[in-house]
């Protein structure tokens, strides 16, 4: 149940907030898609941990690139 809540929040972000912003994610898949994959694969605890680590890497001094959920 908790996993579905977090997935719903990410989907809400993708549908209603992300389109209002200019594309800025330096990674593929995007941070929100990465979050969905991490939540599906690992559940809410590890999925949120991986999402937080990924978002913290998303800054101008990191080169970005291909970074799949492992």
Curated annotation (Swiss-Prot):
InterPro entries with a match to the protein in the record: Membr_insert_effic_factor_YidD
Keywords, ordered alphabetically: Cell inner membrane, Cell membrane, Membrane
Function, as annotated: Could be involved in insertion of integral membrane proteins into the membrane.
Family per similarity comment: Belongs to the UPF0161 family.
UniProt-annotated location(s): Cell inner membrane
PANTHER family: MEMBRANE PROTEIN INSERTION EFFICIENCY FACTOR-RELATED
Name of the protein: Putative membrane protein insertion efficiency factor
Top-rank taxon, per record: Bacteria
Keyword Ubl conjugation: no
Keyword Oxidoreductase: no
Lineage of the organism: Bacteria, Pseudomonadati, Thermodesulfobacteriota, Desulfuromonadia, Geobacterales
Topological type in the membrane: Peripheral membrane protein
Record-linked Pfam families: YidD (PF01809)
Protein source organism: Geobacter sp. (strain M21)
Cellular component annotations (GO), alphabetically ordered: plasma membrane
């Amino acid at each position: 149940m908790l996993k579905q809540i977090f997935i719903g929040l990410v989907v809400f972000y993708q549908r209603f907030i992300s389109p209002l912003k200019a594309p800025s994610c330096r990674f593929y898949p995007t941070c929100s898609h990465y979050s969905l994959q991490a939540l599906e694969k690992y559940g809410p605890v590890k999925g949120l941990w991986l999402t937080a680590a990924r978002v913290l890497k998303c800054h101008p001094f990191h080169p970005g690139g291909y970074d799949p959920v492992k």
